[in-house]
């Protein structure tokens, strides 16, 4: 079973992000807009209850987090992904760190860059065209997210599904 942990924003911000993703993100139908807290990791089916208990224990003392999408940015030249950058806060960093050590299904492969992906799978020309438009349009959205979401990848439907949400203090 493949799981992941994410912060999922309000419906209104999901709609704003999805207005780009529908056009520019081939992964659009697989998952809602989100900030990844724990990248996909694999467990045995019988370990799900244990993972849920570990998540509950690890979020203890973590407050609801402020998410402030500040501008369009990209991972170029590594890859042609465009995203809305989220300002890194101590609370976001702490939440990420609690789930990205050897004691919880391994360390993160990448440094923590909180963001909402809006475009991926682009050719270099597409990237240049789209990035200019998105950067010009800009973004300045702030909200409090008070739940951490545990997701499972459904192979049959080729998409991520919510297993459980956990209230942040």
UniProtKB/Swiss-Prot annotation:
Q: Which domain of life is it from?
A: Bacteria
Motif stretch (HXTX 2): 115-118
| Gene Ontology terms, MF aspect | hydrolase activity, acting on ester bonds
Q: Where is the active site?
A: 34, 115
Name the enzyme group at the top EC level: hydrolase
Query: Which UniProt key words apply to this protein?
Result: Hydrolase
State the span of motif (HXTX 1): 34-37
UniProt-listed Enzyme Commission number(s): 3.1.-.-
What InterPro entries does this protein map onto? 2H_phosphoesterase_YjcG-like (IPR050580), Cyclic_Pdiesterase (IPR009097), YjcG (IPR022932)
Q: Which family does it belong to?
A: Belongs to the 2H phosphoesterase superfamily. YjcG family.
Name of the molecule in the record: Putative phosphoesterase SaurJH9_1013
Organism whose genome encodes this protein? Staphylococcus aureus (strain JH9)
């Amino acid at each position: 079973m493949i799981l992941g942990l994410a912060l999922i924003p309000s419906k209104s911000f999901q709609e704003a992000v999805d207005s780009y993703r529908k056009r520019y993100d081939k992964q659009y139908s697989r998952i809602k807009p989100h900030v990844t807290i724990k990248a996909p990791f694999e467990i045995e089916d019988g370990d799900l209850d244990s993972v849920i208990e570990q998540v509950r224990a690890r979020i203890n003392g973590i407050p609801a987090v402020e998410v402030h999408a500040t501008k369009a940015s990209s991972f170029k030249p590594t890859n042609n992904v465009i995203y809305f950058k989220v300002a890194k806060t101590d609370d976001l960093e702490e939440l990420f760190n609690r789930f990205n050590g050897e004691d919880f299904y391994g360390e993160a492969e990448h440094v923590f860059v909180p963001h909402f992906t809006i475009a991926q799978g682009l050719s270099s020309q597409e990237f240049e065209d789209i990035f200019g438009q998105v950067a010009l349009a800009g973004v300045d959205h702030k909200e409090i997210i008070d739940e951490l979401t545990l997701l499972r990848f459904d192979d049959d439907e080729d998409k991520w599904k919510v297993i459980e949400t956990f209230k942040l203090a």
